[in-house]
Amino acid sequence: MAKGQSLQDPFLNALRRDRIPVAIYLVNGIKLQGQVESFDQFVILLKNTVSQMVYKHAISTVVPSRAVNTAPVPGPDDQSSDA
């Protein structure tokens, strides 16, 4: 199942890391808005005026307010290959 999460986790992590506002549409048509505070295999914690725990199986669509860069952010251990 790790293969199926190879797109989902970096996408949600970029939303969380960059604090990108999102609209989450549930399968019943309800629209939730806020920022992804955290997530795991089963839920997303969405923060607005209150925090809401949203089960992933109830989510239809996640719409970011702007473009999302899922490329990994270079860390302090990454070295340039100028040599």
Swiss-Prot record:
Which residues span the membrane? none
GO terms, biological process? regulation of DNA-templated transcription; regulation of RNA stability; regulation of translation, ncRNA-mediated
> What GO MF annotations does this protein's record show?
RNA binding
Q: Which UniProt keywords apply?
A: RNA-binding, Stress response
Using the record's annotation, list all stretches that form the Sm domain: 9-68
A single GO cellular-component term on record: cytosol
Q: Does the keyword Ion transport apply?
A: no
- Identify the InterPro entries for this entry: Hfq, LSM_dom_sf, Sm
Subunit and partners? Homohexamer.
- Which HAMAP family does this one have? Hfq (MF_00436)
- What's this chain's function? RNA chaperone that binds small regulatory RNA (sRNAs) and mRNAs to facilitate mRNA translational regulation in response to envelope stress, environmental stress and changes in metabolite concentrations. Also binds with high specificity to tRNAs.
Which family is annotated? Answer: Belongs to the Hfq family.
UniProt-recorded name of the protein = RNA-binding protein Hfq
- Protein encoded by which gene: hfq
